[in-house]
């Protein structure tokens, strides 16, 4: 924050403190400005005093809910009537630190103003999930995995939440003033619940009001960064009820109250252990000793909620993660009550495959795409140049090039024919050149040699990957990270160039026509290796062993030395037809000490190769594999990170197409944990983020002084290991005098020092969403995608999900952590097996968890205020209606011996981006032998139910599809990785037993709490099979009648799906009716005239009445077919 911005924020803060009559730095100021506005402020304070009992619109909704919900209780808690309202972004940041200082300390938080942002270290450096989530009785069913709290106890907790001690109410902003301000503070936000899909849905959000003691301004700064600021709740412009089209109809409230951990159970009216029920004893809702503390004095959160759509949560801790996850919880609550929407624990990205085009490329745009059409449709957005190309006005680095143009890096030109003559422009670095179908070309230099430039071509059609239900450590965030950070660069190598080239020539002269195992295919393929009719991919397949080839040919291939084969691929990659037979003269090695070297050169320049790590050997060394020379890392546009709002509708571009899923990221800033940043120079993104900004929200790092920066600058070894942004930060801070503000900074490799002498394992910061930090890349992708679909460049054009691939964290047996390592790199599961996986959401040992177990259905267990069965019903429809295939990728380990960390997580999006829709069709993959069905087997006297793991990829799949990325795809995954049972059959069997037992244990909970009765028929039958081995009808997992329940046609024809659609129509009608009633009531008030006109409420009312008429109609009910509908009953 600049000095000017800080002064503006401070002025705004002082004004608001003055309005509340609270002390502030200008309290005694006699400046002309202060004298001028004081009478106005005095009058406003008097008006506020007379209206002190008036609640804002959202608080009125919350208070009415509490009054009714707790009507039969002894306590009747009241919301604070006066709070410091944070009605503008940035106020919380300014209030979280002293106006005249750089640090603030209380019993529960230590805060520092930094050169690179702000640092807030709460008392507890992490959240926990065990025993934290408590729910009040009297509302919707309480899941078995949550703590059930008597409604009277909840009322007493809520009442005490508003009795914060003075030290927690003290504003950090006035901490150093002679008289400190004490108050409550509040922030209104509108997180997204339903994404907008043109012609299908409008974006809808719910409202949530955070109310916190003044000493916890940093928590409001945190959530405001992630979810935004919805303004002053007292203003009609911000009253959600006056804009029904954008509101889900639901309201949340979150109260922070860290002081509640000192309450005794007895003081809350809990029963003695001898008088308690079994559930109360299990949940710790009773006492043995009079001084027993509630929840043993540990952090907890407790909420009350019912079907009316209001949820009120008290959080007895100030760690930031609880705040974020509570909003996630409430988004999920709103999505379920609204219907037609899901909140998902998911990562995701639009993945655009890319290729290294070398130095020359001729565009092959299909004939039905022309630049003339693009210009005609988007003339107002394009600056058309006389040569016949166009520049995109909103982003001038985007240049539209005519079809069939030629790009040359050698001459640095782009040429085409227009107006009967050849036109030429200079090909510039930093520009994005788009063909009429959206194919993108840009110039790039090699990583190891800035003098070597080549062209990169990027597809205009993304494969949108969605990674839901991914357990901790399963690679949720890795799906959107660029794989290029994992590259290792080298040079093309030959230990004896003359011999190698002789062998390559012999390969080129080989007759390959009789290679097939199927004799009928022999004698049909006569294409020479260097023919323009044979691609590099075709040559890689030609020289890679395969079950399609006969034994003799496979033996021949096995006998080719790897570097000879690689040289053959290299020659093919760079071969130009004009060379004719003389390809050898272009490939040489240097002369060193009078001898041939080993680095292969093309026309005198070293040929650089890219390698990728795919796991580790047992000794810890890296498994490196050479990438195809025409492969380039996919361009990724992040679409999801953690909290996703999604919907399923018929595609907005094609009313006859299969329903598709559309998603949106609910977060503006991303709460990142840079675990690897402790290794200097390794996490380049984290080092850039933490060192380059001046306004970054940071937590659980150690505050450092200017003197420590000078010390680090002189430690040349440590200093040199950092990336450039950190080195520049160190230099800048080292040059600052000790007393210059800000007095502190943080370094990416130095997490917070804890009282026990250790370091925090949970360093955190808020990262600017990549789509916002790199808007040019986002814009280019959006424009390219619209060109490919022939859409106007203006307007919202969301892309549907193409691939669904969840992630699992695998581990070998260790201490008390059981084996969970039966998966190979990539599995496909049909819906029954997939939902067994989703229901159990098993996790092994990971950096984020303390051990093995279940993270709850769809991994939402710790963040779900509702029975998980609601989410399962909707999630099932999101697959059954869309025919999405369910993939599952592995992280951590493959089998007990093959450690892979996140290497596969990073690789899977690249794989799918190079597979077309037909390639990804699992029915075809199964029928053609690319996927292997897992079979049950007997081991050590018992049946091992391996079939629950569905299908897994095999060597044929790897050779064929990974051959689009790697030069030697057949060796990327060993046989022991593709078939983990070969590593250790006992551990493999134990892993599957753990899976089956977890299925049984987790499913049983739905019977214990009775929520199985709320499951749709397919989920109910599946839970019965998981828990008891058979459904009530006697079906097993393999019964055709059972499996038919999951088929699309069966679902569409079912009564239960029809009931969901009826329930959704009824809810929409009810909300519209209530909206009409609220608008009429407001417009009819005597004091609403100016507001009615300013907000165009009469127009809104007419639109809503027309919408209500439509929603009551049979046509609206029919339009809901293909959507998720709504849970018919919640109790």
UniProtKB/Swiss-Prot annotation:
Signal peptide position in this chain? none
Reactions catalysed, semicolon-separated, are: oxaloacetate + diphosphate = phosphoenolpyruvate + phosphate + CO2
Q: Which GO terms describe its molecular function?
A: phosphoenolpyruvate carboxykinase (diphosphate) activity
Q: What class of enzyme is it?
A: lyase
What EC number(s) are associated with this protein in UniProt? 4.1.1.38
> Carries keyword Lyase?
yes
Could you list this entry's UniProt keywords, alphabetically sorted.
Answer: Decarboxylase, Lyase
Q: How does it assemble?
A: Monomer and trimer; forms heterotrimers with PEPCK2 and PEPCK3.
> What role does it play?
Inorganic pyrophosphate (PPi)-dependent phosphoenolpyruvate carboxykinase, which regulates the carbon flow of the central metabolism by fixing CO(2) to phosphoenolpyruvate to produce oxaloacetate. Can also produce pyruvate and diphosphate from phosphoenolpyruvate and phosphate.
Q: Can you tell me which family this protein belongs to? A: Belongs to the PPi-type phosphoenolpyruvate carboxykinase family.
Its name, as the record gives it, is PPi-type phosphoenolpyruvate carboxykinase
Which species is the source of this protein?
A: Propionibacterium freudenreichii subsp. freudenreichii
């Amino acid at each position: 924050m600049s000095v000017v911005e800080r002064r503006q924020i401070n002025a705004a803060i002082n004004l608001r403190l003055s309005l509340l009559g609270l002390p502030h730095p200008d309290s005694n100021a006699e400046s002309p400005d202060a004298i001028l506005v004081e009478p106005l402020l005095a009058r406003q304070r008097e008006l506020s005093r007379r209206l002190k009992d008036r609640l804002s619109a959202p608080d009125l909704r919350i208070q009415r809910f509490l009054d009714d919900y707790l009507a039969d209780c002894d306590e009747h808690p009241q919301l604070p009537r006066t709070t410091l309202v944070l009605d503008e972004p940035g106020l919380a940041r300014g209030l979280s630190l002293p106006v005249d200082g750089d640090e603030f300390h209380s019993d529960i938080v230590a805060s520092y103003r930094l050169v690179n942002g702000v640092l807030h270290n709460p008392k507890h450096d992490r959240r926990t999930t065990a025993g934290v989530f408590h729910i009040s009785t009297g509302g919707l069913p309480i899941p078995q995995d949550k703590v059930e709290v008597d409604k009277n106890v909840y009322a007493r907790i809520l009442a005490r939440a508003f009795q914060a001690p003075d030290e927690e109410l003290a504003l950090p902003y006035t901490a150093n003033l002679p008289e400190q301000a004490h108050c409550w503070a509040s922030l209104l936000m509108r997180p997204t619940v339903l994404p907008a899909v043109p012609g299908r849905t409008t974006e809808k959000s719910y409202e949530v009001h955070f109310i916190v003691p003044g000493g916890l301004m940093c928590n409001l700064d945190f959530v405001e960064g992630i979810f935004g600021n919805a303004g002053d709740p007292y203003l009609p412009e911000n009253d959600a009820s006056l804009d029904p089209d954008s509101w889900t109809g639901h309201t949340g409230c979150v109260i922070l109250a860290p002081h509640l951990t000192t309450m005794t159970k007895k003081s809350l009216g809990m029963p003695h252990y001898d008088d308690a029920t079994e559930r109360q004893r299990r949940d710790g809702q009773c006492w043995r000793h009079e001084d027993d503390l509630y929840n043993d004095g540990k952090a907890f959160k407790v909420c009350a909620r019912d079907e009316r759509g209001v949820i009120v949560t008290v959080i007895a801790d100030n760690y930031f993660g609880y705040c974020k996850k509570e909003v996630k919880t409430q988004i999920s609550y709103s999505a379920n009550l609204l219907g037609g929407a899901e909140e998902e624990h998911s990562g995701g990205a639009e993945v655009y495959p890319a290729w290294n085009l070398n130095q020359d490329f001729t565009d092959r745009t299909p004939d039905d795409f022309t630049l003339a059409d693009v210009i005609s449709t988007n003339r107002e957005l394009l600056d058309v140049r006389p040569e016949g190309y166009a520049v995109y006005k909103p982003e001038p680095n985007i240049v539209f090039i005519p079809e069939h143009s030629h790009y040359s890096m050698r001459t640095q030109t782009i040429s085409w024919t227009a107006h009967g003559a050849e036109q030429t422009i200079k090909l510039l670095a930093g520009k994005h050149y788009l063909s009429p179908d959206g194919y993108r070309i840009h110039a790039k230099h090699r990583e190891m040699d800035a003098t070597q430039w080549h062209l990169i071509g990027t597809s205009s059609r993304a494969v949108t990957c969605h990674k839901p239900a991914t357990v901790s450590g399963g690679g949720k965030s890795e799906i959107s990270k660029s794989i290029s950070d994992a590259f290792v660069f080298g040079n093309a190598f030959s230990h004896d160039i003359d011999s190698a080239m002789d062998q390559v020539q012999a390969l080129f002269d080989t007759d390959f026509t009789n290679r097939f195992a199927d004799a009928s295919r022999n004698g049909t393929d006569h294409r020479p290796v260097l023919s323009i009719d044979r691609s590099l991919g075709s040559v890689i397949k030609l020289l890679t062993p395969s079950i399609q080839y006969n034994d003799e040919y496979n033996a021949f291939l096995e006998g080719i030395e790897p570097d000879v084969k690689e040289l053959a691929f290299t020659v093919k990659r760079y071969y130009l037809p004009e060379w004719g037979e003389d390809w050898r003269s272009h490939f040489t090695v240097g002369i060193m000490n009078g001898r041939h070297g080993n680095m292969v050169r093309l026309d005198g320049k070293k040929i650089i190769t890219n390698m990728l790590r795919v796991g580790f050997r047992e000794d810890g060394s890296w498994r490196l594999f050479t990438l195809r020379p025409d492969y380039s890392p996919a361009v990724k546009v992040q679409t999801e990170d953690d909290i996703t709002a999604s919907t399923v509708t018929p595609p907005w571009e094609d009313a006859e197409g299969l329903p598709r899923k559309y998603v949106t990221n609910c977060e503006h800033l991303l709460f990142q944990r840079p675990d690897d940043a402790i290794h200097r120079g390794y996490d380049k993104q984290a080092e850039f983020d933490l060192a380059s900004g001046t306004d970054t929200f940071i937590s659980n790092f150690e505050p450092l002084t200017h003197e420590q920066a000078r010390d680090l600058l002189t430690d040349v070894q440590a200093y040199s290991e950092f990336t450039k942004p950190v080195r520049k930060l160190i230099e800048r801070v080292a040059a600052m005098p000790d007393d210059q503000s800000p007095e502190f900074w943080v370094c990416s490799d130095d997490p917070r020092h804890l009282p026990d002498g250790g370091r925090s394992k949970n360093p955190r910061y808020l990262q600017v969403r990549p789509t916002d930090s790199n808007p040019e890349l986002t814009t280019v992708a959006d424009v390219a995608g619209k060109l490919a679909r022939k859409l106007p460049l203006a307007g919202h054009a969301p892309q549907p999900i193409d691939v669904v691939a969840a992630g699992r964290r695998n581990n070998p047996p260790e201490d008390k952590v059981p084996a969970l390592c039966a998966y190979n790199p990539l599995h496909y599961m049909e819906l029954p097996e997939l939902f067994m996986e989703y229901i159990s959401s098993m996790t092994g040992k990971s950096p984020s968890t303390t051990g093995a177990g279940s993270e709850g259905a769809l991994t939402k267990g710790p963040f779900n205020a509702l029975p998980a069965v609601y989410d399962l019903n909707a999630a099932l429809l999101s697959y059954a209606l869309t025919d999405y295939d369910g993939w599952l990728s592995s992280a951590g380990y493959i089998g007990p011996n093959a450690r892979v960390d996140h290497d596969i997580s990073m690789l899977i999006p690249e794989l799918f981006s190079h597979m077309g829709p037909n390639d990804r069709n699992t029915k075809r993959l199964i029928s053609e032998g690319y996927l292997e069905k897992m079979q049950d087997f007997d081991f050590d006297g018992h049946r091992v139910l391996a079939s629950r793991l569905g299908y897994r990829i095999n060597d044929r799949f790897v050779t064929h599809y990974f051959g689009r990325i790697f030069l030697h795809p057949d060796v990327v995954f060993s046989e022991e990785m593709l078939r983990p049972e070969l590593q250790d059959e006992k551990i493999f069997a134990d892993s599957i037993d753990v899976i089956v037992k977890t299925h049984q244990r987790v499913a049983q909970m739905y019977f214990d709490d009775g929520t199985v009765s709320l499951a749709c028929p397919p989920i109910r039958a599946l839970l019965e099979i998981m828990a008891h081995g058979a459904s009530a009808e006697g079906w097993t997992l393999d019964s055709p009648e059972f499996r038919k329940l999951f088929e699309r046609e069966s679902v569409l024809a079912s009564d239960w799906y029809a009931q969901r659609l009826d329930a959704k129509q009824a809810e929409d009608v009810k909300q519209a009716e209530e909206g009409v009633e609220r608008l009429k009531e407001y417009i009819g008030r005597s004091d609403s005239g100016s507001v009615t006109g300013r907000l165009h409420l009469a127009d809104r009312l007419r639109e809503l009445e027309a919408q209500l008429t439509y929603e009551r109609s049979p046509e609206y009910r029919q339009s809901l077919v293909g959507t998720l509908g709504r849970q018919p009953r919640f109790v």
